[in-house]
Design a protein with these regions (language model features):
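Structured, contiguous alpha/beta core segments that scaffold functional sites
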Residues: 1-184
Length: 184
């Protein structure tokens, strides 16, 4: 995961903002204009709950935070109305964020949480059956000499200096059990 620093709070804020954007499964006309919202399992995932552990808001936050951490992720359909290996069209009932661990010409190996077993598992799926999302700024944000990495190093250095300057000093407030009177 990303470093526990001020950058984490910035990433978290971006993820929260993204999770508040309304995403819907809709039908468009021939000019690309909105016609109607489709009542589907996919729309349910995008507006109510993505899976039994995550609301749609937490799911989108997971997507965005994973993009910051990994750079490229897969949104994996977990439960579908029909077997997706045999169908060209299907309705998604639940989905999860997965980390892509291996690339193949037509498939990807994905580390994804199995909520039935309570563990992460490696699965291989066709690329055309998962949504592969890439953070276009990942390499820029994580390059050794990027502005963000320089800022992280400087903030960590300032934190270390603050820690050292406070070390070895003892700040105490002493309260005596009786009233002390002095002549003024």
């Amino acid at each position: 995961g990303n470093e526990r620093s001020i950058v984490t709070s910035v990433y978290n804020r971006i993820a929260i903002d993204c999770s508040r954007v309304a995403i819907r499964h809709v039908r468009l006309d021939s000019n690309g204009r909105y016609l109607e919202t489709i009542d589907s399992g996919l729309n349910n995932c995008l507006t109510i709950e993505a899976n039994k552990d995550q609301s749609y808001v937490m799911f989108i936050r997971d997507v965005v935070q994973s993009l910051f951490d990994e750079g490229c992720i897969a949104i994996v359909p977990i439960d579908t109305v029909v077997d997706i290996s045999k169908a060209t069209s299907y309705d998604i009932e639940t989905m999860r964020v997965g980390k892509i661990t291996q690339w193949y010409p037509d498939n990807v190996k994905i580390n994804v949480y199995n909520d039935r077993k309570g563990i992460h598992e490696e699965i291989t799926m066709p690329k055309n059956k998962v949504a592969i999302i890439e953070n276009p700024l990942y390499s820029i944000m994580n390059e050794r000499n990027s502005t963000l990495q320089r800022l992280i190093r400087k903030l960590n250095l300032l934190d270390a200096i603050d820690e050292q300057s406070g070390a070895g000093k003892l700040d105490l407030i002493i309260q005596l059990p009786y009233v002390v009177y002095t002549e003024a």
